[in-house]
A protein has these predicted regions:
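Structural recognition of the beta-strand scaffold that forms the well-ordered cores
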Residues: 13, 45-48, 125-127, 199, ...
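Non-catalytic peripheral regions of patatin-like phospholipases
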Residues: 64-101, 142, 191-336
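Extended, Lys/Arg-enriched charged tracts that mediate electrostatic binding to polyanionic substrates
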Residues: 101-122
């Protein structure tokens, strides 16, 4: 899958952020544009979070299918899964909301696939947050590598038979809408060190999914970061309501993490130890296809509700325009 640049093979990674169906449609636009530029098939590694995991896992599972992007768009246009999963979990005392979510993903997207079904596609990281240790917890498969799950503190184990739908559900278990995924020692042996692990939305730790792409063993040369998450809203007159103040404080912390991740990408590349980064966010106006696309795209809610035709059109157009503009400015050699 690597691309040849100046006579040498180079590896491309694509990071797909969290942000619900809005982010998934934004990423769809990015992947459509990469496909039209002849670069999607050259992607060696996908690192995904939450809404990005929904899109990335489905595309990776069906990597060879010509209609995969059309099928993803149809899914985003016709499914609203959050409400049904929440209500179903409340009414059913024997099955949690997260179990309902995983079953919904499996029915509509993954059809019983396990991580081992990803072997023909790029290396895929589905990122969650381990609330037991505070670390990023990943599920990884594809790219002719082993299927694994784990984290740096507790350890990594084989996971060929782990359900793809459960991995995506863990990555998108946004609190408090969905409870975390609990994994016990029989399924993840290192969990015995802490009784069990509880996995929540990967965006709690790293909403852009950048961490796996910077690991030396993945040897990435170019990093495209598609950030469809919620941009920080500057409010000249913030409310004094306790709940809103807490929300603003959390948003500021997330914005700081986002900025630090971007700085880390830049510094590593400038030091010669990291890939060339091409990062853009849903509120980026520099490179938008049409005036107002960034504002409209940013105003769409970050939930798991179906998107209408106008929303999908803008998100897809905006994502495609931004990724092409970044490549043409920062890595034109990829288009040579």
């Amino acid at each position: 899958m690597a691309i040849t640049v100046d006579g040498q093979e180079r590896r491309i990674a694509l990071a797909l952020s969290g942000g619900g169906f809005r982010a998934a449609a934004f990423h769809l636009g990015v992947m459509r544009k990469l496909q039209s530029l002849g670069l999607l098939s050259r992607v060696d590694l996908l690192s995904c979070v939450s809404g990005g995991s929904i899109a990335g896992a489905f595309v990776a599972l069906n990597w060879q299918r010509a209609t995969v992007l059309d099928e993803l768009e149809n899914y985003l246009a016709t499914r609203s899964i959050a409400v049904s999963s929440v209500i179903g979990g409340i009414l059913d005392p024997f099955e949690s909301r997260l179990d309902k979510l995983a079953k919904t993903y499996d029915r509509d997207l993954f059809k019983g696939a396990s991580l081992s079904a990803l072997r023909s596609g790029p290396r895929l990281y589905l990122n969650a947050t381990n609330l037991s240790t505070g670390n990023m917890f990943f599920f990884v498969a594809g790219g002719a590598g082993p299927e694994e799950m784990g984290e740096h503190e507790l350890g990594v184990v084989g996971a060929a038979n782990f359900s793809l739908a459960r991995a995506v559900a863990a990555s998108s278990a946004f609190p408090p809408v969905f409870p975390p995924l609990r994994i016990d020692a029989p399924e993840y042996e290192p969990a015995a060190q802490v009784d069990y692990v509880t996995l929540a939305d990967g965006g709690v730790y790293d909403n852009m999914g950048v961490n796996p792409t910077l690991r030396p063993r993945n040897a990435i040369d170019y990093l495209i970061v598609s950030d469809g998450g919620k941009p920080f809203a500057n409010d000249a007159q913030p409310t004094e309501s306790g709940g809103m103040v807490l929300k603003a404080a959390l948003d500021i912390m997330m914005e700081q993490i986002r900025g630090l991740e971007f700085d880390r990408m830049q510094h590593r590349h400038q030091a010669g130890v990291g890939p060339k980064p091409m990062w853009f966010s849903i509120d980026s106006t520099n490179g938008q296809a049409q005036d107002g696309d960034a504002q409209f795209a940013s105003s769409i809610k970050t939930n798991l509700t179906s998107l209408n035709a106008a929303q999908r059109a803008v998100l897809v157009r905006h994502g495609g325009a931004l990724v092409e503009s970044r490549i043409r400015v920062y890595a034109p050699e990829l288009l040579a």
